[in-house]
């Protein structure tokens, strides 16, 4: 039976992706390509839409929520997975509304009176069957995948608006988006990049090697020297793992130190973050916010005498509050941290914030 074969194939692909997520999370450093994770998640959701058994938008949303909860549980710190699931749920809502001939925008911008008097959009609204819905949803997911393919390039294209000749730029660790951003600017501008090494993972060394290979004047500094060097810096440009609902960041360890130093010296702090990193999560959600790894890089196991007397924690991420950030550069342009809530409402439906 071809239907049964499809279901077995789909289950195998979901399980393979789950094990990939788990393995990625147990790595030594925080650098797992978020853009690859976003594309893989979206491609898997497209396959679920195409191959799973469902007859209405409500059924499909229930399947995607169920599988989504499993994917998020496999690696809670990888917020990109949850973000793409919410984007696809929004797509399904929009395509269903289009099939019915109504506008999803009207539903989202309901007045306060309507929200209080009605129970909101119930799942009953998604039970109507439309023959073309599957094809329409798949087409919309394909458009999302195309958008994801070009996110880094779209951010890099804006580099010349922000980086000027003979500037001193500081960054921390290694972000592929920031790397592409700086390399794009280097085609027409001469500038100097200072990279904080980002111990204990020391991804900054890889970043510096990559930039110097591209002909950019680069200096690596220890994390402890950030404040001392900041007075000479014109701009700080960083990447992030997640942009939170309040406009804050969950970024690689050491970013908060950098942001505080930049604030003290009134140095602009620019964050390069594609739209798929926007998450409806808040910094008080402790269980998914923090991620700790083995501290053997900080305190080797050979230090036997000290090891028995201390507890060592090695967090992967820092929280950076929105008041320390000057500007976000996403694949659709530049935004102030206070504008994040608006982007969030455009990307995700309020009912999908909790899967």
From Swiss-Prot:
Q: Does the keyword Cytoplasm apply?
A: yes
- MF terms per GO, please? ATP binding; GTP binding; guanyl-nucleotide exchange factor activity; translation initiation factor activity
Its main localization is cytoplasm
Subcellular localization is given as: Cytoplasm, Cytosol
Q: Which domain of life is it from?
A: Eukaryota
Q: Does the keyword Protein biosynthesis apply?
A: yes
Q: Which family does it belong to?
A: Belongs to the eIF-2B alpha/beta/delta subunits family.
How would you summarize the oligomeric state and partners of this protein?
Component of the translation initiation factor 2B (eIF2B) complex which is a heterodecamer of two sets of five different subunits: alpha, beta, gamma, delta and epsilon. Subunits alpha, beta and delta comprise a regulatory subcomplex and subunits epsilon and gamma comprise a catalytic subcomplex. Within the complex, the hexameric regulatory complex resides at the center, with the two heterodimeric catalytic subcomplexes bound on opposite sides.
Summarizing the function annotation, the protein's role is: Acts as a component of the translation initiation factor 2B (eIF2B) complex, which catalyzes the exchange of GDP for GTP on eukaryotic initiation factor 2 (eIF2) gamma subunit. Its guanine nucleotide exchange factor activity is repressed when bound to eIF2 complex phosphorylated on the alpha subunit, thereby limiting the amount of methionyl-initiator methionine tRNA available to the ribosome and consequently global translation is repressed.
PANTHER family from the xrefs? TRANSLATION INITIATION FACTOR EIF-2B SUBUNIT BETA
Its recorded name reads Translation initiation factor eIF2B subunit beta
- According to its UniProt entry, this protein's organism is Takifugu rubripes (Japanese pufferfish)
């Amino acid at each position: 039976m071809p239907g049964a074969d499809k279901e077995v194939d789909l289950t195998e692909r979901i399980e393979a992706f789950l094990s990939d997520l788990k393995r990625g999370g147990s790595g030594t450093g925080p650098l797992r390509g978020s853009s690859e994770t976003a594309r893989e998640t979206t491609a898997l959701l497209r396959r679920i839409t195409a191959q799973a058994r469902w007859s209405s938008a409500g059924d499909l949303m229930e399947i995607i929520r169920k599988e989504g909860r499993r994917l998020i549980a496999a690696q809670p710190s990888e917020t990109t997975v949850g973000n793409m699931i919410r984007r696809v749920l929004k797509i399904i809502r929009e395509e269903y509304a289009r099939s019915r001939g109504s506008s999803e925008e009207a539903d989202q911008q309901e007045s306060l009176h309507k929200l209080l008097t009605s129970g909101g959009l119930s799942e009953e609204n998604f039970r109507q069957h439309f023959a073309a819905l599957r094809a329409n949803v798949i087409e919309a997911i394909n458009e999302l995948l195309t958008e994801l393919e070009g996110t880094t390039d779209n951010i890099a294209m804006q580099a010349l608006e922000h980086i000027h000749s003979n500037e001193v730029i500081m960054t921390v660790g290694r972000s592929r988006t920031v790397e592409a951003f700086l390399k794009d600017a280097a085609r027409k501008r001469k500038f100097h990049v200072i990279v904080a090494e980002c111990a204990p993972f020391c991804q900054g060394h890889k970043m510096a090697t990559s930039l110097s290979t591209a002909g950019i004047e680069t200096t690596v500094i220890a994390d402890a020297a950030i404040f001392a060097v900041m007075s000479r810096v014109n701009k700080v440009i960083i990447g992030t793992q997640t942009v939170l609902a309040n406009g804050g960041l969950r970024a690689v360890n050491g970013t908060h130190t950098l942001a505080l130093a930049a604030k003290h010296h009134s140095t602009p702090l620019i964050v390069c973050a594609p739209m798929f990193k926007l998450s409806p999560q808040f910094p008080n959600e402790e269980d998914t916010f923090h991620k700790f790894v083995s501290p053997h890089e900080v305190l080797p196991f050979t230090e036997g005498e000290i090891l028995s007397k201390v507890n060592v924690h090695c967090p992967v991420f820092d929280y950076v509050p929105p008041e320390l950030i000057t500007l976000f550069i996403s694949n659709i342009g530049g935004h102030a941290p206070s504008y994040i809530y608006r982007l969030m409402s455009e990307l995700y439906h309020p009912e999908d914030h909790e899967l």
